[in-house]
């Protein structure tokens, strides 16, 4: 009898334990937050009313900051669409992603992204607008990957300016939301194509903005009506992103889902203007970032001074979802979850080890001989930006005779080029398009526009050497091919479009392949020295 009683008791304990584990598993499943990732296309840090900007109004972004966290030092490691978004998805630096380090590239199937990992972990995933790209993402069998989830692009709406997409992003999100079952965790990528160019010139003023609202024009551009109009047209498109974000937040709130959702709002890199997008200066890589998640973040209205970068987002999303391992879909991640910041209290510097970020680039847009890129690596701290240009003999924004193709066409670009051609001014041209020395050093605490290169100053040699050594140490830990003497591999990787291959040589021989992102007048009549 005693033995039977013991066996019965043991059986009950086993059954209880199994049921308890089932209940805990179910509880964990229900507790996992929904995830909304809201990413603009070419939106610079500081251009939100939460940051004190007077000429861009962003009530939705401001709400996230007010009810969550606002970051002052968030960065993309690579300021171009495809490599920046690849970094977000994988949690790895672009120089760790082989072909995906480049722009308009194939995305190697061995590098899975967080949306694919969330899907495998029980999340329903979808996106509207722009996901990853430009490029192609296929699995090992050649089938398209759902790299940012299922596409929701059907709803259209007439925008208030002709340069803005007709995509009704918020309505497309609502379609996705209507398909979800109660208790089912989901992750949605809301990606606008705004404020990417082109713009309707003068739309900012037409819609009520004034040129004198802009309190500061960067020192590397001419301060005139053309520049200010261009900036206000950009502002209208930032506000379009924010308007749809506001509609999405309202929809979640109406359905009682907002507080159960981890919301992250940011941009892939800086604004599509000369010397910003596609470069490696402070304004190129510095991005806005606000995060709201009442169930997972301690306190609200906190302003964070820690240096964080896009490699940190994927590990954050996986930790929030209770996914302990990125594999086998994802490779090991280089970033660090933001949960140390989430679980702390107060503002300012939370983790003293988050005191620097790495930046860099390889091949972006076409237009140089031999399909060359313009390789850079750099390191940024609260005081300093150090940059190493590996090929200073090359043109940083692309060759002049092929239209400076790594800089989008714009009224501002046109006036800078025309000022040089007419002999009126070369200052902005030199800063935006001219060749650069091998090393650059800027005291960004005092010179955020990166106007005064201190690299050749004997007074600052110790600073340059210290930062270069620290950068190289970090890059060696990443097994960066540039640090291993194998940097040429990046220029050998294929394009996804045959029309891009040997563009420079074909153009110089008389072909005229399509280059719709620049203006015909961007092309110089002859090569420049």
Annotated model-derived regions:
Residues 483-498:
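Short, charged, surface-exposed hinge/linker loops at domain edges
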Residues 7-18:
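Bacterial N-terminal signal peptides
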Residues 1, 15-16, 358:
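Short, low-complexity interaction segments enriched in Ser/Thr/Pro/Gly
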Residues 4, 22-440, 448-469, 473, ...:
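Formylglycine-dependent sulfatase
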